[in-house]
Amino acid sequence: MLDAAELLHFRLPAVTADTLVVCVSQSGRSAETVRVADALAGRHSRPTVVAITNGADNPLAALADIHLDTRAGEEHGPSTMTFAATLVMLEAVATALGASSTDGAEAAALAAERLVTDAEATADSLASWLDDRPVLTLLARGGARAAAEMGALTLKEAARFPAESLQAAQFRHGPLELAGPEMAAIMFSTSAATRTLDVGMAAELQAAGARVLVIGDDDVLGSGGAGFALGRLSDCLSPAVAVIPTQLLAWSLARARGLDPGGYTRATKVTERE
């Protein structure tokens, strides 16, 4: 996975005719993503470009060799619907390329429904868990990093809260000094391969006095403290469910601050310039 602007300005020469480039843009109009597709389309020997967007009438879809429409519908503010819908499309792409089909969409949908059964009460309990702590770090490994990145972005966009997303192993290389009573941490742990490491980090942060929330499959909650059990979900779709508690937290914080969680004051829904 590469940031489109980094690919455009620094790594585009590494893309060859044998490369499959999957461009993701909610609007299909994001400046740097469209410029990547345009630059590749102008090559004599061009790679195959797949575009994933919400809707078909956009420049990115027009430039792509293959276009996948998430059909998420009209969306205002943070990309909550399109984030989940994009993960469904990415799993479809992976399956088409030969990955094992998990047929996990129904399980993910049911898990998401459970999390929002009493959305307002859950949102308020998450705000109480944070309890005015000024430091909130979202930690994850592997595919769960998508949930951590999106969660931190939503907290910034919707609640103007300066949450930070970090790869869990990188967190030990210095940022661990943040651990203490003023810190809150959300650990996303959806992979059995790193569960022991995730649980150990969560316990270490708790021992340092931090408030810790663990989001993962049923086994990970044995680490103690607060948490959300998601059940067994596919690796690709689990971030769409795991991110929901952070969305609810952002909504509660925005409401408490008198903000519109679906509105912007400086950013825009569609970013058409770098």
Give, region by region, the residue ranges found by the protein language model.
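Glycine-rich phosphate-binding loops that contact phosphosugars or nucleotide phosphates
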Residues: 1-109, 181-184, 188-236, 240, ...
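Composition- and surface-driven signal marking solvent-exposed, interaction-prone regions
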Residues: 151, 199-201, 242, 265
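Peripheral docking tails and interdomain loops at the edges
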Residues: 229-274
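Residue-level detector of functional hotspots within protein domains
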Residues: 1, 7, 52-53, 122, ...
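Active-site phosphate/pyrophosphate-binding segments
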Residues: 66-184, 194, 257-274
